[in-house]
Design a protein with these regions (language model features):
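Generic structural signal for well-ordered, non-membrane alpha-helical segments
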Residues: 5-12, 16, 47-55, 84, ...
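A general structural motif
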Residues: 12-14, 95-98, 144-154, 194-201
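A glycine- and small/hydrophobic-rich beta-loop-beta segment
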Residues: 131-169
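Glycine-/charge-enriched secondary-structure boundary and capping motifs
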Residues: 54-61, 65, 70, 74-90, ...
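Glycine-rich phosphate/pyrophosphate-binding loop regions near the starts of catalytic domains
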Residues: 1-123, 128-139
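Charged, low-complexity, helix-prone segments enriched in Lys/Glu/Asp/Gln
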Residues: 19-23, 34, 147-155, 161, ...
Length: 278
């Protein structure tokens, strides 16, 4: 919703692209979507503008990703005391997995595996969770969605899963790279030792930016050079950012954060929020 409020067109594209990445990240071929379009009063020009912009973005993404809408519904006039809800296009995607034994999960599988970041990272913080929750700011443009890059990168990741070279896969979205890595570490109960952010990108943008069309993939050492060479040959951005191992997530030059501590924060947030402790 925050993306759509700032830029309905890009927000509509992103909603479809994220569903496409979710299906891709398990190794399935994305087939179709259902949409649930929730907006305020369309008799107000600004609300109708949001609705039309989001639909244009959804349509563009569906065409490029070959991910058609096969069902859906629309809910309008959602407002309280004259104030409309945030524009919320909800997208559900379905895909086909030919062989469930060749599917992927986000959990780190073993120590000593290479962690790869696939897709271009610029450190885009506009409308990010980091900007909102850490900095207390809701501003800027959302990250642009390059649909051609989404298609290319996703097809490559799906091929890696089917070939058995990807041992764990997680698509990046809310919270950015470091949040995804923490989720992978918690799921597998295996830590990660990470390289520092590249000098060309500010650290908070690198770790928490929400650039689109990206995945974290782990591969065995025996497959690493082959994977890097193949992706370089087809001009898919890919860089090794660290290795799995240990009982903490550690960035070079920083203090480690134990998986146990991450899990406690993750699992306690909702109960604490409902109890009014946050």
């Amino acid at each position: 919703p925050r993306y759509c409020e700032a830029d309905p067109f890009e927000g509509g594209k992103q909603a479809v692209a994220e569903a496409w990445r979710n299906v891709t990240a398990v190794g399935a071929k994305p087939l179709a979507i259902t949409d649930n379009l929730n907006f305020g009063n369309p008799e107000r020009p600004e609300i109708m503008g949001q609705f039309v912009g989001a639909l244009r973005g959804i349509a563009d993404a569906c065409r490029v990703l070959d991910f058609p809408v096969v069902s859906g519904n629309v809910s309008l006039y959602n407002e309280t005391n004259g104030r409309g809800i945030l524009p919320t296009p909800s997208i559900g995607g379905v895909g086909l997995l030919d062989d469930f034994t060749k599917s992927a999960t986000l959990a780190f599988k073993a120590e000593g595996e290479a962690i790869l970041l696939i897709g271009e990272t610029k450190g885009w913080l506009g409308q990010s969770i980091y900007l909102r929750d850490v900095c207390g700011r809701e501003e800027g443009a959302p990250p642009p969605v390059d649909l051609a890059a989404e298609k290319r990168n996703g097809d490559v990741v799906r091929g890696m899963i089917r070939a058995g070279t990807a041992t764990a896969v997680h698509d990046l979205s809310d919270g950015g790279l470091l949040v995804a890595l923490a989720e992978m570490a918690m799921a597998g109960n295996i830590g990660a030792v990470l390289d520092a952010a590249p000098a060309a990108i500010v650290p908070h943008g690198y770790w928490f930016g929400e650039d689109q069309a990206r995945y974290v993939v782990t591969v065995r050492d025996a497959d690493l050079l082959g994977v890097l060479s193949k992706l370089k040959a087809i001009e898919v951005p890919c860089v090794q950012i660290g290795k799995t191992g240990g009982d903490a997530v550690t960035i070079a030059g920083e203090q480690p954060v134990k998986i146990e501590k991450l899990r406690h924060a993750f699992e306690r947030w909702l109960p604490d929020y409902m109890a009014g402790k946050n």
